Design a protein with these regions (language model features):
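Radical SAM enzyme [4Fe-4S]-AdoMet core and its adjacent flexible, acidic
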Residues: 105-125, 172-175, 235-266
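Proteins enriched for Cys/Gly/acidic motifs involved in redox and nucleic-acid/cofactor modification
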Residues: 1-104, 142, 157, 179-190, ...
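Glycine-centered loop/turn positions within well-structured domains
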Residues: 7, 58, 103, 137, ...
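Short flexible coil/turn linkers enriched for glycine and charged/polar residues
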Residues: 42-46, 56-57, 153, 163, ...
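Conserved SAM/AdoMet-binding glycine-rich loop
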Residues: 89-213, 221
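Terminal RNA-binding accessory module
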Residues: 243-333
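Residue-level signal for inorganic ion chemistry
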Residues: 9, 97, 131, 159, ...
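Short, hinge-like loop/turn segments at secondary-structure boundaries
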Residues: 17-19, 113, 147-149, 216, ...
C-alpha cells in the first residue's frame, strides 16, 4: 500500500487473520491518490507544524517523491485557518507551514499560497507564522513583499537550490536556473536585509563533474545567505538520473560536502555576528543546559538566557551581546 492507504493496513491485517480469509494482493497506485489529510504536530508546546499541502507534480530526475506521495493537493484555506485557530486556542505561539511543495498550494482548491498566508496572518493570538521550504520558482516577489510588511510572518526563508551549476540543474530537471535563484535572494535582501536565508544543496549527483561543482561553490561563495543544508546524493531506483553515465565517488562526495559545510559555518557565524547588539523577539521554548533556556528569534537565531520555568512559552524582546557555541551549535546571549 502507499502513503494514502497506510491507515488501512490494520483492517487488511485483521481480514487476513480471519478463519475464512483468502490470500489477496492489495496494491495502491499513486495516480489514485486524490484526498488531502489535514494534520498538525508539535515538537514542544510553543511551535506547531501545520501541513497545508501534500504530493508533488514536479519530476526532478533524482527524486521519487511524486511516485510515493502522489499528485499535488491541499486543504482549503477555510479548513486550514480553522485548524490554526484550534492550535492557537490550545496555547500554540508559532505555526510553521509545511508540505511537500507548499508553493504549489491551491492545485486542488483553486486558491493561492499567498492568500493562505494572508488569512493565517489575521489570526488573533498567533505570535509568529513561519514558512518552511519553498521552491525558488514559486517564491514570488509578491510573497516576499508581503512577508516584509507583516508583523507575524517571520523573516526566514528556506529555499532549495540543489546546485549552483546550471548544467547540473538541467540534469536534475529543476524549474529554474542560477540567475533566477540569485534574483530571489537579492530581492529578499532588498526588502528584508536581515532575513535568515537557508539553502538546500545536493553534492555528488550523477553528472556533477568537478568543474560543475566549482561553479556551484563559487556561486554560493558570492551569495548573501545565512546557512546551507548539505546533502550527499544517493541513488534512488526508478529515477531517470540513473541514465546519466558520469558518477561521483563516495570519497569525492565527502570532500565536496565538507567544503560546502565549511562555507556554511563561516556564513552562519557572520550572520549571527551581524545580530549582536540588535533587539530580538524571542519565543522561549525549553530548558537548554548549564542553567539556561533556549528560544528562537524571528530571524531563526538561537538565543539563550537564564532558565525561568514561568517564561517557557512566552515571548520577550532581548538584546544579545555575546555569541557563544555549545554542543548544539551557535547561540546568542
Amino acid at each position: 500500500v502507499g502513503a494514502e492507504q497506510k491507515l488501512d493496513i490494520a483492517p487488511h491485517l485483521e481480514a487476513i487473520g480471519r478463519p475464512t480469509a483468502e490470500a489477496r494482493l492489495v496494491h495502491g497506485r499513486t495516480r489514485d491518490i486524490h484526498s488531502f489529510h489535514l494534520s498538525s504536530s508539535s515538537d514542544e508546546r510553543t511551535r506547531h507544524f501545520l501541513k497545508v499541502q501534500d504530493g508533488c507534480d514536479y519530476h526532478c530526475s533524482y527524486c521519487t517523491i511524486p511516485k510515493a506521495r502522489g499528485r499535488s493537493r491541499n486543504g482549503s484555506i477555510a479548513s486550514l485557518v480553522e485548524e490554526a485557530e484550534r492550535i492557537v486556542a490550545a496555547g500554540g505561539r508559532e505555526i510553521v507551514l509545511t508540505g511537500v511543495n507548499i508553493g504549489d498550494f491551491g492545485r486542488s482548491t483553486g486558491e493561492r499560497f499567498i492568500d493562505l498566508v494572508r488569512a493565517l496572518d489575521q489570526i488573533e493570538g498567533l505570535d509568529r507564522l513561519r514558512i518552511s521550504s519553498i521552491e525558488p520558482n514559486l517564491l514570488t516577489d509578491e510573497l516576499i513583499d508581503y512577508c516584509a510588511t507583516s508583523q507575524r510572518v517571520a523573516p526566514h526563508f528556506h529555499i532549495p537550490l540543489q546546485s549552483g551549476s546550471d548544467e547540473v540543474l538541467r540534469l536534475m530537471r529543476r524549474r529554474y536556473d542560477s540567475t533566477l535563484f540569485r534574483q530571489r535572494v537579492e530581492h529578499i535582501r532588498r526588502v528584508l536585509p536581515e532575513a535568515f536565508i537557508g539553502i538546500d544543496v545536493i553534492v555528488g549527483t550523477r553528472g556533477e563533474r568537478p568543474e560543475y561543482f566549482e561553479d556551484c561553490y563559487h556561486f554560493l561563495e558570492e551569495l548573501d545567505f545565512s546557512q546551507l543544508h548539505v546533502f550527499s546524493y544517493s541513488e534512488r531506483s526508478g529515477t531517470s538520473a540513473l541514465q546519466i553515465q558520469y558518477t561521483v565517488s563516495p570519497q569525492e562526495k565527502h570532500k565536496r560536502s565538507q567544503r560546502l559545510m565549511r562555507l556554511s559555518e563561516a556564513k552562519l557565524r557572520r550572520y549571527y555576528e551581524r545580530h549582536l547588539g540588535r533587539p530580538q523577539e524571542v519565543i522561549w521554548e525549553q530548558g537548554f543546559y548549564e542553567g539556561l533556556m533556549l528560544g528562537h528569534s524571528e530571524y531563526y537565531l538561537r538565543v539563550a538566557q537564564p532558565y525561568d520555568a514561568a517564561a517557557v512559552g512566552t515571548r520577550s524582546r532581548v538584546t544579545p551581546h555575546q555569541l557563544l557555541e555549545g554542543e548544539q551549535g551557535l547561540y546568542l546571549r
